[in-house]
Amino acid sequence: MSLKIHAFPPSPRGFKVISVAAHLDVPHEFVFCDLTKGVQKTPEFTALNPNQRMPVLEGDGWSLWESNAIAQYLATLKPGLLPMDEKARADVTRWMFWESSDWDPACATLIFERFVKGFFGGGPADPAEVEKGLTKFHRAAKVLNAHLKGRNYICGGQLTVADFSIGAPLIMAVPAQFPLEDYPEIRRWYAQLAALPAWQKALAMGQMPQAA
């Protein structure tokens, strides 16, 4: 089976998929898709994902979009990040759904206002939107921080794909100025993820390629 990962590595959602594939050593071809040049709006990419968003996993005659769906699919290909027990696997899925519904939107607001707008020349951050983002961030961070107390990982005491999913937005913690000072459990847990070889490999891929 031939797989291609179409992604923009600096994006947390692209990073999520790339880091899972790297950790599991899933054979694939990586296709760098430059968001800054509008690659996602081309007819070729739209055929893979009509939403015109990254990342996308492309197989032989099929494609899969939504970063958590891709990450979980990759975790089924090799053992290591997805429990075999049905209840434990449901717990992983539960936290990945939470990442999509609560954690990612909270982080994404701050990332957009404090980093993306400036990067793309979209002007300064909107204070009202930043305040909304901070409210959402603190609400979600309190849940995550409390859950991590006494735990090394999100689910069942072992590293799972849920850790990669929830940890991915934190690669933007510095430029987006995430207020993590009140959340020591998140900082401790994230330090473990950041030390993973696959995490470091994916971070290195996030460097924008130089023009030819």
Regions found by a protein language model. Give the residues of each.
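Long hydrophobic alpha-helical segments typical of transmembrane helices together
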Residues: I186-A212
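Active-site-flanking alpha-helical
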Residues: A75, P169-L170, L203
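GST-like domain detector, emphasizing the conserved glutathione-binding G-site
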Residues: M1-E131
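Conserved beta-strand edge residues that scaffold enzyme active sites
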Residues: L35-T36, A162, Q207
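Structured helix-beta-strand junction loops
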Residues: N51, L77, G150-R151, L196
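GST-like fold's C-terminal all-alpha helical module
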Residues: P83, K87, W95, E99-A195
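Residue-level detector of family-conserved "landmark" positions at structurally sensitive sites
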Residues: V31, S67, Y183, L203-A204
